[in-house]
Amino acid sequence: MLRAFEYRLYPNKEQVELINKHIGSARFIYNIGLEVNNSSNENKTTPFDRNDLIKQIPGLKKDVEWLKEINSQSLQAPIKNLDNAFKRFRRKTSGYPKFKSKWSGKQSFHIPQNIYFDDGKLSIPKFREGIKIELHRAIKGAIKFATISRRPTGKYYVSIVYDTGVGRKPKPPIKAETTIGIDLGIKDFMVSSEGDKVNNPRYLKNNESKLKYTQRKYSKK
Protein backbone atom coordinates (compact mmCIF):
# COMPACT_ATOMS: atom_id res chain seq x y z
CA MET A 1 0.00 0.00 0.00
CA LEU A 2 1.32 3.45 -0.92
CA ARG A 3 1.60 6.21 1.66
CA ALA A 4 3.08 9.72 1.58
CA PHE A 5 4.76 11.99 4.10
CA GLU A 6 5.80 15.61 3.65
CA TYR A 7 8.93 17.10 5.18
CA ARG A 8 10.40 20.59 5.43
CA LEU A 9 13.68 21.14 3.56
CA TYR A 10 16.44 23.60 4.47
CA PRO A 11 18.55 23.99 1.32
CA ASN A 12 21.65 26.18 1.28
CA LYS A 13 22.05 29.03 -1.21
CA GLU A 14 23.58 26.83 -3.93
CA GLN A 15 20.88 24.18 -3.48
CA VAL A 16 18.11 26.78 -3.64
CA GLU A 17 19.43 27.89 -7.02
CA LEU A 18 19.53 24.31 -8.33
CA ILE A 19 16.07 23.50 -6.94
CA ASN A 20 14.66 26.58 -8.67
CA LYS A 21 16.30 25.50 -11.94
CA HIS A 22 14.66 22.08 -11.62
CA ILE A 23 11.30 23.74 -10.94
CA GLY A 24 11.77 26.04 -13.93
CA SER A 25 12.75 23.13 -16.17
CA ALA A 26 9.57 21.23 -15.23
CA ARG A 27 7.44 24.21 -16.24
CA PHE A 28 9.59 24.82 -19.37
CA ILE A 29 9.34 21.22 -20.64
CA TYR A 30 5.60 21.02 -19.89
CA ASN A 31 4.90 24.22 -21.82
CA ILE A 32 7.06 23.15 -24.78
CA GLY A 33 5.23 19.81 -24.92
CA LEU A 34 1.87 21.59 -24.90
CA GLU A 35 3.00 24.08 -27.56
CA VAL A 36 4.30 21.29 -29.84
CA ASN A 37 1.05 19.38 -29.45
CA ASN A 38 -1.10 22.47 -30.10
CA SER A 39 0.81 23.51 -33.23
CA SER A 40 0.66 20.04 -34.79
CA ASN A 41 -2.84 19.16 -33.62
CA GLU A 42 -5.09 22.15 -34.26
CA ASN A 43 -8.33 20.17 -34.07
CA LYS A 44 -7.27 18.66 -30.70
CA THR A 45 -8.29 15.15 -31.75
CA THR A 46 -4.93 13.42 -32.30
CA PRO A 47 -3.71 11.51 -29.21
CA PHE A 48 -0.78 13.07 -27.37
CA ASP A 49 2.49 11.26 -28.22
CA ARG A 50 4.45 11.32 -25.00
CA ASN A 51 7.22 8.96 -26.15
CA ASP A 52 7.98 11.09 -29.21
CA LEU A 53 8.41 14.19 -27.05
CA ILE A 54 10.60 12.36 -24.53
CA LYS A 55 12.91 11.35 -27.38
CA GLN A 56 13.36 15.02 -28.24
CA ILE A 57 14.67 15.99 -24.79
CA PRO A 58 18.37 15.12 -25.51
CA GLY A 59 18.32 17.42 -28.55
CA LEU A 60 16.66 20.13 -26.50
CA LYS A 61 19.44 19.91 -23.89
CA LYS A 62 21.98 20.70 -26.62
CA ASP A 63 20.11 23.89 -27.51
CA VAL A 64 19.30 24.98 -23.95
CA GLU A 65 22.56 24.85 -22.00
CA TRP A 66 21.17 25.06 -18.46
CA LEU A 67 19.02 21.96 -18.97
CA LYS A 68 22.23 19.91 -18.69
CA GLU A 69 22.22 20.69 -14.97
CA ILE A 70 18.86 18.97 -14.53
CA ASN A 71 18.27 15.31 -13.68
CA SER A 72 17.25 13.55 -16.93
CA GLN A 73 14.34 11.69 -15.33
CA SER A 74 13.06 14.90 -13.77
CA LEU A 75 12.95 16.32 -17.32
CA GLN A 76 10.79 13.42 -18.50
CA ALA A 77 8.29 13.75 -15.63
CA PRO A 78 6.55 16.93 -16.97
CA ILE A 79 5.85 15.15 -20.28
CA LYS A 80 4.25 12.29 -18.37
CA ASN A 81 2.22 14.80 -16.34
CA LEU A 82 1.07 16.45 -19.57
CA ASP A 83 0.11 13.05 -20.97
CA ASN A 84 -2.04 12.43 -17.88
CA ALA A 85 -3.63 15.87 -18.31
CA PHE A 86 -4.62 14.98 -21.89
CA LYS A 87 -6.02 11.64 -20.73
CA ARG A 88 -8.23 13.43 -18.19
CA PHE A 89 -9.33 15.82 -20.94
CA ARG A 90 -10.31 12.94 -23.25
CA ARG A 91 -12.22 11.29 -20.39
CA LYS A 92 -13.96 14.64 -19.86
CA THR A 93 -12.93 14.77 -16.22
CA SER A 94 -11.02 18.05 -16.67
CA GLY A 95 -10.56 20.85 -19.18
CA TYR A 96 -7.97 21.17 -21.93
CA PRO A 97 -4.41 21.48 -20.51
CA LYS A 98 -3.19 25.04 -19.93
CA PHE A 99 0.28 26.54 -19.99
CA LYS A 100 1.97 26.74 -16.60
CA SER A 101 2.99 30.10 -15.17
CA LYS A 102 5.93 30.81 -12.89
CA TRP A 103 3.59 33.08 -10.92
CA SER A 104 1.28 30.26 -9.80
CA GLY A 105 1.27 29.57 -6.07
CA LYS A 106 2.91 26.17 -5.75
CA GLN A 107 5.87 25.20 -7.97
CA SER A 108 7.42 21.73 -7.98
CA PHE A 109 9.46 19.08 -9.75
CA HIS A 110 9.40 15.30 -9.64
CA ILE A 111 12.17 12.82 -8.75
CA PRO A 112 11.22 9.30 -9.93
CA GLN A 113 14.04 7.33 -8.24
CA ASN A 114 17.45 7.30 -6.49
CA ILE A 115 16.12 8.98 -3.34
CA TYR A 116 17.92 8.38 -0.05
CA PHE A 117 18.31 9.72 3.47
CA ASP A 118 21.75 10.06 4.99
CA ASP A 119 22.65 11.72 8.30
CA GLY A 120 19.65 14.06 8.38
CA LYS A 121 19.90 14.94 4.70
CA LEU A 122 17.95 14.13 1.54
CA SER A 123 20.09 12.71 -1.27
CA ILE A 124 18.78 13.04 -4.85
CA PRO A 125 20.41 13.07 -8.33
CA LYS A 126 22.36 16.19 -9.42
CA PHE A 127 22.73 17.48 -5.85
CA ARG A 128 26.32 16.77 -4.82
CA GLU A 129 25.59 17.48 -1.18
CA GLY A 130 22.46 16.24 0.55
CA ILE A 131 19.72 18.73 1.38
CA LYS A 132 19.06 19.24 5.08
CA ILE A 133 15.66 17.80 5.98
CA GLU A 134 13.41 17.87 9.05
CA LEU A 135 12.74 14.14 9.19
CA HIS A 136 10.01 14.18 11.84
CA ARG A 137 8.65 10.77 10.91
CA ALA A 138 10.48 7.62 9.83
CA ILE A 139 9.64 6.00 6.51
CA LYS A 140 9.08 2.28 6.91
CA GLY A 141 9.04 0.96 3.36
CA ALA A 142 10.52 1.30 -0.12
CA ILE A 143 10.60 4.86 -1.47
CA LYS A 144 8.82 5.06 -4.85
CA PHE A 145 9.22 8.73 -5.83
CA ALA A 146 9.43 12.25 -4.44
CA THR A 147 8.22 15.75 -5.30
CA ILE A 148 10.04 18.88 -4.15
CA SER A 149 7.91 22.02 -3.99
CA ARG A 150 8.40 25.72 -3.30
CA ARG A 151 5.58 27.50 -1.49
CA PRO A 152 4.60 31.16 -1.96
CA THR A 153 6.27 31.78 1.41
CA GLY A 154 9.61 30.75 -0.11
CA LYS A 155 9.80 27.60 2.01
CA TYR A 156 10.72 24.24 0.46
CA TYR A 157 9.15 20.86 1.11
CA VAL A 158 9.52 17.32 -0.16
CA SER A 159 6.67 14.81 -0.42
CA ILE A 160 7.90 11.21 -0.24
CA VAL A 161 5.68 8.41 -1.56
CA TYR A 162 6.62 4.95 -0.34
CA ASP A 163 5.32 1.39 -0.36
CA THR A 164 4.56 -0.01 3.09
CA GLY A 165 4.75 -3.56 1.73
CA VAL A 166 1.40 -4.28 3.33
CA GLY A 167 -1.54 -4.98 1.05
CA ARG A 168 -5.07 -3.83 1.76
CA LYS A 169 -7.03 -6.31 3.84
CA PRO A 170 -9.32 -8.20 1.45
CA LYS A 171 -13.03 -8.19 2.13
CA PRO A 172 -14.35 -11.56 3.35
CA PRO A 173 -16.23 -13.51 0.66
CA ILE A 174 -20.02 -13.53 0.81
CA LYS A 175 -21.33 -17.01 1.60
CA ALA A 176 -24.67 -18.03 0.12
CA GLU A 177 -25.63 -20.07 3.18
CA THR A 178 -25.27 -17.04 5.46
CA THR A 179 -26.94 -14.53 3.13
CA ILE A 180 -30.59 -13.49 3.32
CA GLY A 181 -32.70 -11.10 1.27
CA ILE A 182 -34.56 -8.21 2.89
CA ASP A 183 -37.67 -6.39 1.59
CA LEU A 184 -38.75 -3.03 2.96
CA GLY A 185 -42.42 -2.06 2.96
CA ILE A 186 -45.11 0.07 4.56
CA LYS A 187 -47.16 -2.60 6.32
CA ASP A 188 -44.11 -4.41 7.66
CA PHE A 189 -40.93 -2.42 8.09
CA MET A 190 -38.73 -5.36 7.07
CA VAL A 191 -39.33 -8.92 5.85
CA SER A 192 -36.41 -11.33 5.42
CA SER A 193 -36.24 -14.09 2.81
CA GLU A 194 -36.74 -16.53 5.68
CA GLY A 195 -40.11 -14.98 6.56
CA ASP A 196 -39.07 -13.06 9.65
CA LYS A 197 -40.92 -9.75 10.04
CA VAL A 198 -40.05 -6.53 11.81
CA ASN A 199 -42.91 -4.16 12.60
CA ASN A 200 -42.83 -0.56 11.48
CA PRO A 201 -41.48 1.98 13.97
CA ARG A 202 -44.23 3.97 15.70
CA TYR A 203 -43.40 7.19 13.87
CA LEU A 204 -43.95 5.44 10.54
CA LYS A 205 -47.23 3.89 11.66
CA ASN A 206 -48.53 7.27 12.69
CA ASN A 207 -47.75 8.68 9.27
CA GLU A 208 -48.80 5.69 7.16
CA SER A 209 -52.10 7.29 6.13
CA LYS A 210 -50.28 10.48 5.10
CA LEU A 211 -47.85 8.47 2.99
CA LYS A 212 -50.67 6.64 1.21
CA TYR A 213 -52.56 9.91 0.61
CA THR A 214 -49.49 11.61 -0.82
CA GLN A 215 -48.77 8.62 -3.04
CA ARG A 216 -52.35 8.67 -4.46
CA LYS A 217 -52.22 12.47 -4.90
CA TYR A 218 -49.07 12.47 -7.03
CA SER A 219 -49.94 9.31 -8.95
CA LYS A 220 -52.94 11.19 -10.46
CA LYS A 221 -50.75 14.02 -11.82
Where do the PLM segments sit?
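Nucleic-acid substrate recognition interfaces
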Residues: M1-K221
